[in-house]
Amino acid sequence: MMNLQQIYVYLKESFTKKTQGRKTNDITKTADKAFYSVGDYFPNKESREGIVVFDGSDGRHPFTICGMKFQAMTKKCKGEEKRVVEFTFKEALRKFPTFFNHSKDEWYIPCAEELEQMARMVDEKKFPARIFAHLWSCEESDFMSTYLAKSISICSTNPACHDCHCIDSKKEWKHKVLLFRQIN
């Protein structure tokens, strides 16, 4: 299995026209309230698992996430009702298994054993405590954002210690950082 420091989790989002009226790259800088207008990640105290939430459906159209369609549900987020699709981080790993291999400089789909090993590490709380996601928003499109979540070992005294990998240097991308937090 690859070293987790060499893995990027790649989630490609396609949103409905509902997101056009919002600033899709807005984000708070507070780690505990990490939230952006088209998605969220927060601890689920009942299950002790993190939840990845994709928000942006207007209720008439299903979400398209990594080419797969999902029907949204109504849920209260940050005190207001939103149409959302949610997964645990472990589910997201299994549903969207596309990774970036730094040593070979290419995208690849890992084998089942690798996915199961990563899922076990999440179960056993051996996954890195902090997971950073980089939000890249293309200037030319209001419908699509690309998420790169990098699983890395972070210096506890410097949670901002990380590096970035631009997936397309030919386009003008806006770069924002979202902190994904894993419950220890």
Task: Locate the predicted segments by residue.
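C-terminal, surface-exposed recognition/capping segments
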Residues: 112-184
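Extracellular adhesion/carbohydrate-recognition regions
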Residues: 7-107, 145, 150-155, 170-180
